[in-house]
């Protein structure tokens, strides 16, 4: 496309869109009435419960239900008469006033008490800053199948309310509309399985799959919110352009830009705690996409036939459209054109956005992070070359310079999937744990174990996929998990190597972590026998908790001996596994642990000497 024609098209479509999909608030006297009517009472209540649970993570379900009931009754009255008292107040004002009026708020949430002295929007910003990514809450344990089904059948609404509350307060940035979708799926599973002859056999695999989906969704949304907060809307919009260009390669750049702008607004609203607006605008975006399928994708119809929640989620996960068969070589517009520097100088964001769009739609097999790194490399090359006497001679081989950037994640995927296939998930997690403990031994052992277990699941998520889907799956998943590592590390920074990777560009973060060497500045921990002393209770732990106990011991061994070889660690952990198996078979298990434990510790010290 000729550049002048393209700029004109973008200007016209952009101007039209500025009056577009989401510009509706002025027509409503009452924002809360508007959202209540749009969403319906069921979803309105769910989102209000979720909002309060995200902000007040220590409150009980019963306390939140009382707040939800009061807000819903108020919204219902405003829907009947939008000019009624206080109905014209903003949602931030209404919700903030409700939080600050709670009895004993200052005692229970002393760290947030100062927020209530502020005015909007500073008050809401203050509440957001106090969301805790790692709240000190007990692990959420699933009830036995019979007890679960009894509670669900006695009061399905209360049962699902508890589910929303518990997920929300543990994941204060979870994407609100998606949590409602998962709650609906949860309800469907319980309805089906509680009528089955073997409730447990029906429930366990289905609920395990939903839990895994929720955990992955939580870290992915947290990455989006981190990106938005740290680098602003422009960075997120670039992510959205790349992602949507891959999914909708037949849509033109103006359409992709429009969709990316909308998605950025929706994501910003959810990250900002504006869940009612976020859910409402997400539904509006889905409506727009379904009304404009012809200009977006041929794969949308099945999604568009679904009801609101399912429709939006289906569109978010829709398969890639078929790539156009006649796409010209990219070099024509971005390398060979004599006006490359002129076009870049006249409209940098548009020119780079077009490059990202064109490159992304041709490479659905790349991760979004990789595509953004390539765009960053292209931008840096133009910045350098367009200032030189012969720009084309300078940037003429820029596409050749992309090769090492592409090969690095491809090699990462190949080597890690081969290791996963050889070791299985648990063995692969252990390999990752050793690798990252050596890179950042100062990080707390629980954080290292959590990170390694999450990073290790990348094999299960991605390595069985077709080759063309592996790279985007692996790198985008790793980026989300490493973002959580960074968030936890920011609270108590202990490793300069981790700080270096976490403080840089988001798209460079995964390569930075992958390239980290063993931390040679680390002074090994003193060997303490009590760290490796176990008791009979380990024998009755669920398999997951037993694995975590063993992984904790493994991390501590590496911290004691960072230079330990793979063979040394394998020998020690093999002896440890035999020790557990032997003692857990004994009638007097504790006596076995007391007798054999010190021997194991002595042998381990000797093996690592």
Swiss-Prot record:
Q: Which residues carry this modification: N6-methyllysine?
A: 559
Keywords on record: Calcium, Cleavage on pair of basic residues, Copper, Disulfide bond, Lipid-binding, Metal-binding, Methylation, Phosphoprotein, Repeat, Secreted, Signal, Zinc
Provide the residue ranges of the propeptide in this protein.
19-24
Modifications made to the protein after synthesis: Phosphorylated by FAM20C in the extracellular medium.
**For binding Ca(2+) 2, which residues are annotated in this chain's numbering?**
38, 280
GO MF term list? DNA binding; enterobactin binding; fatty acid binding; metal ion binding; pyridoxal phosphate binding; toxic substance binding
Q: What is this protein called?
A: Albumin
């Amino acid at each position: 496309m000729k550049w002048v024609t393209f700029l004109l098209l973008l200007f016209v479509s952009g101007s039209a869109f500025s009056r577009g999909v989401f510009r509706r608030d002025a027509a409503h006297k009452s924002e809360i009435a508007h959202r209540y009517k749009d969403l319906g009472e069921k979803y309105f209540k769910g989102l209000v419960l979720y909002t309060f649970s995200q902000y007040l993570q220590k409150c009980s379900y019963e306390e939140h239900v009382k707040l939800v009931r009061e807000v819903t009754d108020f919204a219902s009255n405003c829907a009947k008469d939008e000019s009624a008292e206080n109905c014209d107040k903003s949602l931030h004002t209404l919700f903030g006033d409700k939080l600050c009026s709670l009895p004993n708020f200052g005692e229970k949430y002393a760290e947030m008490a100062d927020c209530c002295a502020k005015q909007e929007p500073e008050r809401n910003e203050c509440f957001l800053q106090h969301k805790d990514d790692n709240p000190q809450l007990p692990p959420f344990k699933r009830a036995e199948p019979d007890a679960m089904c009894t509670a669900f059948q006695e009061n399905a609404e209360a049962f699902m309310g508890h589910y929303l509350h518990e997920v929300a307060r543990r994941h204060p940035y979870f994407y609100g509309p998606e949590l409602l979708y998962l709650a609906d799926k949860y309800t469907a599973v319980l309805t089906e399985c509680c009528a089955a002859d073997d409730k447990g056999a029906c429930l366990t695999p289905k609920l395990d799959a939903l839990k895994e989906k929720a955990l992955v969704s939580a870290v992915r949304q947290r990455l989006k919110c981190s990106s938005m907060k740290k680098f602003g809307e422009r960075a997120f919009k670039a992510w959205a352009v790349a992602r949507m260009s891959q999914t909708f390669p037949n849509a033109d750049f103006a359409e992709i830009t429009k969709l990316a702008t909308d998605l950025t607004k929706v994501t910003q609203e959810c990250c900002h705690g504006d869940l009612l607006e976020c859910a409402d605008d997400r539904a509006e975006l889905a409506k727009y996409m379904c009304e404009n399928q012809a200009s977006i994708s041929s794969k949308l119809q099945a999604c568009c036939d679904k009801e609101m929640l399912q429709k939006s989620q289906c569109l978010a996960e829709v398969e890639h459209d078929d790539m156009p068969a006649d796409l010209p070589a990219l070099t024509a517009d971005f390398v060979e054109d004599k006006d490359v520097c002129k076009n870049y100088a006249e409209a940098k964001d548009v020119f780079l956005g077009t490059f990202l769009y064109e490159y992304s739609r041709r490479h659905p097999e790349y991760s979004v992070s990789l595509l953004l790194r390539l765009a960053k490399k292209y931008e840096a090359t133009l910045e350098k070359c367009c200032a030189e006497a012969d720009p084309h001679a300078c940037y003429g081989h820029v596409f050749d310079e992309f090769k090492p950037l592409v090969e690095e994640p491809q090699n990462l995927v190949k080597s890690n999937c081969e290791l996963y296939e050889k070791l299985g998930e648990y063995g692969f997690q252990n390999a990752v744990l050793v690798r990252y403990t050596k890179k950042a031994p100062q990080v707390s052992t629980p954080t290292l174990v959590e990170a390694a277990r999450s990073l290790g699941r990348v094999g299960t998520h991605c390595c069985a996929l077709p080759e063309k889907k592996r790279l985007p799956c692996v790198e985008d998943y790793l980026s989300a998990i490493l973002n959580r590592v960074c968030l936890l590390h920011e609270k108590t920074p202990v490793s300069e190597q981790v700080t270096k990777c976490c403080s840089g560009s988001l798209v460079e973060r995964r390569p930075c972590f992958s390239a980290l060497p063993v931390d040679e500045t680390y002074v090994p921990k003193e060997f303490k026998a009590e760290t490796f002393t176990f008791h009979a209770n380990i024998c009755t732990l669920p398999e997951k908790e037993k694995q975590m106990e063993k992984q904790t011991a493994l991390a501590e061994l590496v911290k004691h001996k960072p230079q330990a070889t793979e063979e040394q660690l394998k020998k020690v952990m093999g002896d440890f596994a035999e020790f557990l198996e032997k003692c857990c078979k004994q009638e007097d298990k504790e006596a076995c642990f007391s007798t054999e434990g010190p021997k194991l510790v002595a042998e381990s010290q000797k093996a690592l000497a």
